[in-house]
Amino acid sequence: MIKLTQEEQKYLFDSIRIIPDFPKKGIIFRDITTLLNNKEALNFLLKHLKERYKDYNLDFIAGTESRGFIFASMICAKLNLPFVPIRKPGKLPFETFSCEYDLEYGSDKVELHKDAFKNIQNARVLLVDDLIATGGTAIASYELIQKAGAKCVEACFLMNLKDLNGANKLEKLTSVYSVLEI
């Protein structure tokens, strides 16, 4: 498995803006727009992910709304693979599978078109999002992929917020790769 060195990780981490107390006091927000706006860092990241996934024999890459769309679609372009969106409720126009997950105060839901994987049984799918925190969205997305008859071969995140344990929960279901462990 191809992973970055500590020096390479620092290079990418330094390209992400840190904003304390956003969106509310006590939260440290990691703003990826500065990475997206840095062509050298962005191309370095995409080259790394292309190298990592080029031999995975993937059929599709699924990205979760909304920042997961950004990275998933760019990886799709690098690997010449189709993109599958996993969206918030009511945003997809055709028949969907849905999966509900718990939030700190309440619940939310994600949806996937029933024919997203073109009825290819056991299609090999890479799940992509910008970060994993508690794991709720990622686990629900994994379950949607399974519900649609495909296989999530790995979940890839730009950042893993280690203290929130989401990656550990998801690793019970599928392989997890995080470019940056925070």
From Swiss-Prot:
EC class name: transferase
GO molecular function, one term: adenine phosphoribosyltransferase activity
Pathway this chain belongs to: Purine metabolism; AMP biosynthesis via salvage pathway; AMP from adenine: step 1/1
Main location group: cytoplasm
EC number: 2.4.2.7
Intracellular or extracellular location(s): Cytoplasm
InterPro entries: Ade_phspho_trans, PRibTrfase_dom, PRTase-like, UPRTase/APRTase
GO biological process annotation, one example: AMP salvage
SUPFAM superfamilies documented for this protein: PRTase-like (SSF53271)
A UniProt-annotated Pfam family: Pribosyltran
Catalytic activity from the UniProt record: AMP + diphosphate = 5-phospho-alpha-D-ribose 1-diphosphate + adenine
Keyword Cell inner membrane on entry: no
GO CC field: cytoplasm
The UniProt record lists the keyword Transferase: yes
Keywords attached to this entry: Cytoplasm, Glycosyltransferase, Purine salvage, Transferase
Highest taxon of source: Bacteria
Family named by the database record: Belongs to the purine/pyrimidine phosphoribosyltransferase family.
Assembly and binders: Homodimer.
PANTHER family linked: ADENINE PHOSPHORIBOSYLTRANSFERASE
HAMAP family: Aden_phosphoribosyltr
Role, per record: Catalyzes a salvage reaction resulting in the formation of AMP, that is energically less costly than de novo synthesis.
Protein name: Adenine phosphoribosyltransferase
Gene source species: Campylobacter jejuni subsp. jejuni serotype O:23/36 (strain 81-176)
Lineage of source species: Bacteria, Pseudomonadati, Campylobacterota, Epsilonproteobacteria, Campylobacterales
